């Protein structure tokens, strides 16, 4: 998890999945409240995945003196297609019943970025903000706390979109996107390395938005790393192998740092490529299972291909289970799930 003060508002960036995550959220809010000098009791959850852990944390905080406001765009668009989506719908209903008008859950189609769900400074007096630990969570939290710039909403939508479009926003947005692209992947032998690097990136970017020259210089150093990663991606793209009709796999195990957005874009230049797969030894699933397979549906096929169809309908999105998937066009699995479920399904 990452913690920052954004315009004096304590902010926690976290993806809640476990009981430990619930405790971390509740403890963070309680600690923030103990240092809070205002009279408000509001805690904002924004761009937070609608998981069982998220609901549990909100239930605990609501049972205390806190007024919880929930804003998010991870709702299910239409009828649930599988058990995972069914659980999201059930959790959504729980939150709506618990929070009433303080709960606003929409879908990405209507709100590509969560920053569009708040006005500038709407929660500048909040006790705390809890957000997803990605660029969309950061931009939404900073806007809620009172820091913004003219292109923020458009930039946020790109930052939360496909990797290849994340670097196409304003110059300040590109500094964040390229910095995110070259963060060290999660390594179980150095479990804090990625988190600490991301915390420094977020802190520098917030300063850069306000014009801090030293922070901008540090971000531009990350851009040099990004440029090298792009070159590596170009080399890796030439090693792609079709493992099923329209499915191209690239093995990046023990390879230098690469940019996923560039790699995907190069692979998708082939009109027959429906799904890209990256095999890697780092990431939240790899940290537990050793190897991780990351699948992404090519943009032109996203209305036709649902990756949730490749795993059992009752599959749980959890690194321990070897599956992570919050949207239909992205799926991360362990080697066991890939070999025994996903690859056979792709080959039909």
What are the language-model segments listed below?
Residues 190-193, 198-207, 212:
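Eukaryote-biased recognition of electropositive, low-complexity segments
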């Amino acid at each position: 998890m990452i913690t920052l003060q954004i315009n004096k508002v304590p902010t926690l960036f976290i993806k809640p999945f476990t009981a430990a995550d619930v405790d971390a959220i509740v403890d963070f809010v309680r600690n923030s409240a103990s240092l809070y000098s205002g009279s408000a009791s509001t805690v904002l959850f924004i761009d937070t995945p609608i998981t069982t852990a998220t609901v549990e944390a909100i239930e605990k905080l609501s049972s205390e003196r806190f007024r919880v406001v929930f804003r998010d765009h991870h709702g299910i668009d239409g009828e649930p297609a599988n058990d995972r989506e069914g659980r999201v719908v059930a959790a959504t209903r729980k939150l709506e019943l618990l929070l009433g008008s303080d709960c606003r859950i929409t879908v990405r189609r209507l709100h590509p970025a969560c920053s569009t769900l708040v006005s500038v400074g709407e929660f500048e007096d909040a006790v705390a903000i809890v957000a997803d630990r990605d660029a969309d969570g950061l931009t939404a939290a900073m806007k809620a706390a009172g820091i913004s710039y003219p292109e923020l909403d458009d930039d946020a939508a790109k930052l939360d979109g496909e990797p290849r479009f994340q670097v196409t926003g304003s110059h300040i947005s590109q500094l964040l996107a390229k910095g995110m692209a070259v963060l060290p992947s999660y390594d179980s032998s150095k479990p804090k390395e990625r988190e600490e690097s991301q915390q420094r990136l977020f802190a520098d970017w917030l300063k850069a938005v306000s014009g801090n020259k030293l922070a901008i210089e540090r971000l531009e150093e990350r851009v040099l790393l990004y440029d090298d990663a792009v070159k590596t991606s170009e080399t890796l793209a030439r090693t792609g192998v079709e493992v099923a009709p329209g499915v191209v796999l690239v093995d990046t195990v023990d390879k230098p740092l690469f940019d996923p957005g560039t790699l995907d874009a190069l692979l998708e230049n082939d009109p027959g490529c429906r799904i890209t797969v990256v095999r890697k030894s780092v990431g939240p699933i790899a940290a537990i299972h050793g190897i991780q397979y990351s699948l992404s549906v090519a943009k032109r096929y996203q209305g036709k291909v649902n990756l949730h169809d490749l795993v059992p309908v009752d599959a749980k999105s959890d690194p321990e289970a070897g599956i992570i998937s919050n949207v239909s066009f992205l799926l991360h699995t362990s080697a066991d799930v890939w070999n025994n479920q996903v690859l056979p399904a792709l080959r039909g």
